[in-house]
């Protein structure tokens, strides 16, 4: 009853007074600790912005916040801290997540430690949700120039600078608990996840490297490469309008050898391995997360309850927003999202147009290299254009996703963040992978055949695959995009904040004014750091999700993707640490017990990876045609001679025949006088050039393989998920033990209240309550 009475006194307002100011048991801290600062430009007293500024600050004072004003030459700094009464209310609201036992007095509660992270989190929430009498929020005032910035202060970061945020500590274990104490659980979980992801990339990277190196054994020994290199008598039909000449198949010898570095039988094994790897990675991560949040006392922490408590601290008259669902709003959002996806697909078509036009442009170029290597130049420049498109569309996608979230009107900040994550990732996925989907599954399949080619606007012939297939194009596209994202993005991610910080510091030092007040110097130093926002950590997660997509989706075409990701992540961990500690203002510490919606994103990518890799092996690589030839048309079946290579004659078998007289303008092709036949990659029969029986048989086998591959891979994923429990037994046992001890404690207090009848001795509590005190309590220390 005493706990309920104290909660009533703290929450219920009396008349016009604010309840926090009525708490006499909480005294102001003796030592002033300013952890949060607002910054504004100096205004004259007649400036209307000055009055609006004072109204906002007065509202904060009324809610129990202390404000210290320090004026500099151009700025005014407002140090803000909460009265102890605010933390008293916080303790009471979150004293026991499950509520007190009926008819039982609770033991004296363990005091929730008022850490710097907790103070910052409460102050930040109230500042962001505080409203003046005119209904203006801090964001409204910032837009009108009333305030310039808000940020928590860096304090006590010296140890993190020495032990974590340095390049020489790249291979050291991260001080996760110190990161959590300084930046909060959300940032700490990001680094825990990133560290675990990097660690798990080691076996994937080594396996991918082994598969790639095994291709070198086929560099000279491959029967297919030998036949291509020795095919001096086979003339290939012109691939496009830029190449109006016949080409000997042997001229593509080097290209064919390079293709077989990664288009070999090991690709299938590696694709299945990566499907299993993705599942094991996620399952073991869930176990790792369970151990970490148990250690942090957050196993039963409820984000929604925490946000409601902060809302009540900010405004005792806060009205709960119930869950609502509007089918009309959901339909509008779905339609708008689909329109954006169609735009992404349209961007892929723009890239197709570019590649077609670039082929025509390079073929008439005055540069000999471009004229001779048209296909290579088109592939490389196309990848660069796609990378630039990604940078531009990322900004557009963010704005669209934000507008969709505003229209959807989510209840809470966490719900808004979750929905924004889904919208933004969906748009980013199509932005990054649209060109890869085109190359993998469309390129060379809709271009018709020699003599009757599909043309863009009736003028330009669509590009075709190389004589060795489209796998090389897909490999180059992935290598360039992923390589640029890992190298350029990391360079920009570090250099831009570093240069910006240096420029801000130089401009401040040129003024020649150095404050004497050490507190003002500290606040000014924090002000000169690079600003952060809600998306700072979100952007880091998004970058890693896209990288994870490149590492798993289409990995059959690029087995070196895990190796590139491993090297990139080793740099990324320290790069993010240096940014957060040295170059940026302090992030607002936020609590979390998992990585949220990102886990669903990872699981979705895992499923898409199985489907995409199955289709790449079936439709893009030459694996299925090779297997069908080996067991249906191979000379091994006819001669019964084991010494004969079963792929002998495969190249000739996979090329269709075209009569040069069927060209619309055969005389316009260089060297056509003595050529009656040319070959091209397809399964068609002259004279009508319709698809042959082999084509339909291969198509059936390809579809059957996709279904079989997906079912086998998904079954392996399900078995792995079942075999590896999400929560370790040790965690379950600790949780069970604490539940039992807690019930015994309540039983003892209940018997004491009833007069001591059969009360017995007080049950012993766990000797080491750190990880096992998760239910005692409070789950609020940071």
Curated annotation (Swiss-Prot):
The modification Phosphoserine is found at residue 250. It catalyses: a 1,2-diacyl-sn-glycero-3-phospho-L-serine(in) = a 1,2-diacyl-sn-glycero-3-phospho-L-serine(out); a beta-D-galactosyl-(1<->1')-N-acylsphing-4-enine(out) = a beta-D-galactosyl-(1<->1')-N-acylsphing-4-enine(in); a 1,2-diacyl-sn-glycero-3-phosphocholine(in) = a 1,2-diacyl-sn-glycero-3-phosphocholine(out); Ca(2+)(in) = Ca(2+)(out). GO terms for biological process: calcium activated galactosylceramide scrambling; calcium activated phosphatidylcholine scrambling; calcium activated phosphatidylserine scrambling; chloride transmembrane transport; establishment of localization in cell; lipid metabolic process; monoatomic ion transmembrane transport; sensory perception of smell. It is found in: Cell membrane; Endoplasmic reticulum. Residues 756-782 are annotated as: Disordered. The keyword Transmembrane applies. It comes from the Eukaryota. GO terms for cellular component: endoplasmic reticulum; plasma membrane. Phosphorylated on serine residues by cAMP-dependent protein kinase A (PKA) which is essential for activation of its cation channel activity. The chain crosses the membrane at residues 199-219, 265-285, 332-352, 374-394, 424-444, 553-573, 605-625, 704-724. GO terms for molecular function: calcium channel activity; channel activity; chloride channel activity; chloride channel inhibitor activity; intracellularly calcium-gated chloride channel activity; phospholipid scramblase activity; protein dimerization activity. It is a multi-pass membrane protein. Glycans are attached at residues 641, 652, 674, 690. Cation channel activity is activated via phosphorylation on serine residues by cAMP-dependent protein kinase A (PKA). Belongs to the anoctamin family. PKA-activated nonselective cation channel. Discriminates poorly among cations but is more permeable to Ca(2+) ions than to monovalent cations. Acts as a calcium-activated calcium permeable channel which may operate as a endoplasmic reticulum (ER) Ca(2+)-leak channel, reducing the loading of the ER Ca(2+) store. Regulates intracellular Ca2+ signals, ion channel activity, and cytokine release in the renal tissue. Plays an important role in olfaction, amplifying cAMP-evoked cyclic nucleotide-gated (CNG) channel currents in the olfactory sensory neurons. This is Anoctamin-9. It comes from Homo sapiens (Human). The lineage of its organism: Eukaryota, Metazoa, Chordata, Craniata, Vertebrata.
